[in-house]
Amino acid sequence: MNKKVYKTLEYNKILTMLSSYAACDETKKRCLSLEPITDLYEIRHLQTTTADALSRLYKDSGVSFVGIHNVHASLKRLDIGGALNTTELLRICSLLEVAKRVKAYGRSAMDNEKQDSLSGLFAGIEPVSALCDEIKRCILSEEEIADDASPELFKIRKSIRGMNDRIHAQLTKLMNNSTTRTYLQDAVVTMRDGRYCLPVKAEAKGNVPGMMHDQSSTGSTLFIEPMAVVNLNNELKELFIKEQEEIEKILAALSDKVAMNAAALEQDYEILSELDFIFAKANLAKSYNGVAPDFNTDGHINIRKGRHPLLDAKKVVPIDVRLGEDYKQLIITGPNTGGKTVSLKTVGLLTLMGQAGLHIPAADRSKLAIFEDVFADIGDEQSIEQSLSTFSSHMTNIVKILEKADDRSLCLFDELCSGTDPTEGAALAISILNRLHQYGAITMATTHYSELKVYALSTDGVENACCEFNVETLSPTYRLLIGIPGKSNAFAISSKLGLDENIIEDAKSRINDNDLDFEDLIASLESQRQTIEKEQLEINSYKAEIEKLKKQLEEKNERIDKSKDKILREANEEAYKILQDAKELADKTIRNFNKYGQGQAPMSQMEKERSALRDKMNDKEKKLSDIKKNTAKANHKAPKKLRIGDSVLVLSLNLKGTVHTLPNAKGDLYVQMGILRSLVNINDLVLLNDDVSPAKKYGGSGSKIKMSKSLSVSSEINLIGKTTDEALALLDKYLDDAYIAHLSSVRIVHGKGTGALRKAVHGLLKRTKTIAEYHLGEFGEGDAGVTIATFK
């Protein structure tokens, strides 16, 4: 690819930014030399690794790669039998510490997550912790080996300390001698050539026997090693030699261990430097909120909300650019400082960044094409040495572009063919654009020439664009508007700035009528565009509000459905429980009947328990009724159309009947239920199909019991021939069944006789809470041998 364009589009500045996020020196160099590539699959792979690293950064912060060192040279020396020094060993230790840290980060960042493109790299890291720990144990710094690096070194250094103490004691003894002290310049011990000496006055040289190792610059002081410590210094020197030999053994042993792990170290360095590079790209993307664009080889560009990465993100106005699909050339017109050049550079720079595997500062679903070459003629690139004019400089560059451009090229021109006669310049510009159009090159060009606007309007595959300008504020908005040619606004701006209107009108009269009409047409189109855009914003606002209300309604309906299902479920559970309790009560009643019928307990006890059971049954009946009302409310819709004779279920009574009259204005109508005709409201009815029983559809098993009861319970009971206890037990159960079956009244035949049975029956009726009133039968009803009881 043409490398000259890197500087023109400021791609090199992006690489400098990228290198600032790298930790390793080798990675920094790699960042600064990063170039765009043209292989689609490799580009997608690079974008994927950057995206996965960015995802990890957002999810689990980052990890430091500081401490990575290139160990290739050290490992190569080990191959030829050399040993490593402390600096090299500490760098290897540093590399292993980074490996351990990064390995842990890779594991924690992906806990409970699926594998990504970086998982293999993290898995390939081998920290070799034992080697790292051994190096840290033995080497304290580049200049210091630990005493306990080996037992022998510990022993030698202990001897050195002992010898030092002996020498210092001997020299101190000499200095404390009053005679010797007069020969010394200072009462201090010094070291020369690795041997302990005393500073002796030059004139007292013969008074202190020993070996002279040095003298001061003035010659007034001689540094003499007294004979009393010569042998001790010799022994100390031997100990230092032994110490160095032992240190070399320790370093050699560590070097051997490094050599044993050379393959792992090579792999760790390669992986860590690769991850350092990938995370540098991710951190760069994070700094400008970058995204991975979609790539194609069809020349289609669709940058959504693109921003120039070198401009202040808080101030830059995002642009939308579509190019290469419906049209292959985009001609941008408009006033200076309106953002035309920035738009050109943004498209070119984002293309280079994307093909280099870098995320671009744009919105999701942005699309970039892969180009074999990117050409740009932007700015004043004339050479003083070449003595070229502005026009000649640009034309020289354009000639080179025309020689190399093809259908896999992106060509960018700023003020194409400016700097010469406008008529000739416009003609040249159109011809150059036409040639590039024939090549199939994707082209963007900025211009002030009105002729190029006409060229774009009259040529297939060429589109106009402009950078919006606010005439009221005399400032550009920096928005790129595709499909609309730009207007110079010279007259409007001059008028706003106070230029005499007569001068402006005179200037207009000097313009060709066709040109003036064309400019007026552009102004009209721009006004219409702004109106349409404003209306579109309002429509979008309404649509957003409608979507919001729709979502709220759907959520409300969902809550209602869930509540309805919950009510039905709880109702069924409660109904089942009530029926179970009722069954147990019935069983207990039967057991008590058998028990008391056999005379095993007093009558008062039986009546007491019967009364308690009846109260419980009444309570269960009320609960079941409430549940059925709630169930009906949750599941019921009133019938829309009723005809006389339709089968219906009266929810409040849980009885099946037929429509006897049509509903009135209030929705009230008469329903015939057996011998009972009742006035009900239409909202209390459910229209039944002939093939669906009301019990099955609306009442569950409880409704089945009630319906069967209403069909089987007689309105009369005959107690003649029964003992008092038997009669009362039968009557008590009969009254419960009749009440449950919704009978309004019953006829109790007890006979006249002695009146004892009648008296017992009346006593039971008096105690029964469901009985509203009772009386002996009148003439024709059975007279005193019958009692008529009416339910509440």
Swiss-Prot record:
Single biological process term from Gene Ontology: negative regulation of DNA recombination
Stored InterPro entries: DNA_mismatch_repair_MutS_C (IPR000432), DNA_mismatch_repair_MutS_core (IPR007696), DNA_mismatch_repair_MutS_sf (IPR036187), MSSS (IPR046893), MutS (IPR045076), MutS2 (IPR005747), P-loop_NTPase (IPR027417), Smr_dom (IPR002625)
Pfam families, A to Z: MSSS, MutS_V, Smr
SUPFAM superfamilies xrefs: DNA repair protein MutS, domain III, P-loop containing nucleoside triphosphate hydrolases, SMR domain-like
UniProt keyword annotations, A-Z: ATP-binding, DNA-binding, Endonuclease, Hydrolase, Nuclease, Nucleotide-binding, RNA-binding, rRNA-binding
GO molecular function: ATP binding; ATP hydrolysis activity; ATP-dependent DNA damage sensor activity; endonuclease activity; mismatched DNA binding; ribosomal large subunit binding; rRNA binding
Keyword rRNA-binding set for record: yes
Entry binding sites for ATP: 334-341
UniProt KW Hydrolase keyword: yes
Transmembrane annotation, as ranges: none
Limits of the Smr domain: 717-792
Xref: HAMAP family: MutS2 (MF_00092)
General function of this protein: Endonuclease that is involved in the suppression of homologous recombination and thus may have a key role in the control of bacterial genetic diversity.
Protein name: Endonuclease MutS2
